[in-house]
């Protein structure tokens, strides 16, 4: 508790307030404000039966219990506000998480800078053969360079047209429409901890698109500083855990007993079987 402000503060977060954490080639994320800490979570959980502050070890055990049993309300007592600069196509994925408050830079009122995202060669990949919305293996260096050069040339070309439209007096709300999705935008994004952790579980996953995953990874480091007990529980029970179906559990029990189990007799789909075998470090 800070005596001057009469509110709980987290020194590790105060130390990085407004500090830009660089992401991608022109992007960043920074903490603008926050409310609450690990203590706010346990305080909310204990209010129903009037218990006061406990020892750290007891707080940690309670937070693990809440996370393990999906008691979400106490985690909603903490909130954090970010200022994010990111490519428009990343922002469109990001904004699908509708449980936050957001206000975005408006190209109706302001002129966008000539800043666009250019992928690194290793990120210029072919369409995945088994994932309709994901990337597969990278192109050869020559093809990657050709694609990147085209992206850069196209981006510069449309921006030159955008500038010409503005000079001609075209309304900004129309002039912006020819800009590509790799141009950068900015927004303020405020969210409670429960919904933030859900966002991070999806976007920090190895299957998430690289360009949004790198933002999520920076946010994970920030969460670790802000609410370390909740962060550890999240990693333990959500981020690095596995969801296994009833049938999957039956298969595991049989394997523990030394029984031979096949996918066909288990009545389980190929994809789920492969995921289960991957979890168990067994060949499918």
From Swiss-Prot:
UniProt keyword terms in alphabetical order: FAD, Flavoprotein, Methyltransferase, NADP, Nucleotide biosynthesis, Transferase
Gene Ontology MF annotations: flavin adenine dinucleotide binding; NADPH binding; thymidylate synthase (FAD) activity; thymidylate synthase activity
E.C. number: 2.1.1.148
Note describing how the cofactor binds: Binds 4 FAD per tetramer. Each FAD binding site is formed by three monomers.
Protein family: Belongs to the thymidylate synthase ThyX family.
Function summary: Catalyzes the reductive methylation of 2'-deoxyuridine-5'-monophosphate (dUMP) to 2'-deoxythymidine-5'-monophosphate (dTMP) while utilizing 5,10-methylenetetrahydrofolate (mTHF) as the methyl donor, and NADPH and FADH(2) as the reductant.
Protein name (database record): Flavin-dependent thymidylate synthase
Gene that specifies this protein: thyX
């Amino acid at each position: 508790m800070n005596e001057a402000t009469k509110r709980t503060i987290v020194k590790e977060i105060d130390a990085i307030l407004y500090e830009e954490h660089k992401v991608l080639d022109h992007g960043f994320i920074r903490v603008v404000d926050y409310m609450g800490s690990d203590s706010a979570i346990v305080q909310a959980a204990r209010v129903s039966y009037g218990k006061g502050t406990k020892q750290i070890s007891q707080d940690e055990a309670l937070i693990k219990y809440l996370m393990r049993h999906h008691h979400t309300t106490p985690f909603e007592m903490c909130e954090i506000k970010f200022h994010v600069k990111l490519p428009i196509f990343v922002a469109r994925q990001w904004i699908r998480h509708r449980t936050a408050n957001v206000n975005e830079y408006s190209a109706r009122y302001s002129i966008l800078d000539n800043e666009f995202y250019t992928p690194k060669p290793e990120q210029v990949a072919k369409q995945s053969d088994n994932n309709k919305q994901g990337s597969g293996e990278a192109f050869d260096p020559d093809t990657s360079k050709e694609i990147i050069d085209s992206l850069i040339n196209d981006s510069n070309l449309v921006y030159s047209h955008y500038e010409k439209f503005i000079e001609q007096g075209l309304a900004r709300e129309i002039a912006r429409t020819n800009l590509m999705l790799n141009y950068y935008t900015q927004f303020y994004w405020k969210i409670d901890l429960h919904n933030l952790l859900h966002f991070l579980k999806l976007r920090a996953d190895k299957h998430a698109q690289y360009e949004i995953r790198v933002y999520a990874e920076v946010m994970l480091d920030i969460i670790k500083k802000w609410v370390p007990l909740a962060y550890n529980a999240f990693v333990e029970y959500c981020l690095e855990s596995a969801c296994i179906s009833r049938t999957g559990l039956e298969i595991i029990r049989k394997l523990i007993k030394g029984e031979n189990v096949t996918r066909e007799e288990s009545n389980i789909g190929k994809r789920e079987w492969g995921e289960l075998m991957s979890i168990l470090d067994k060949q499918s």
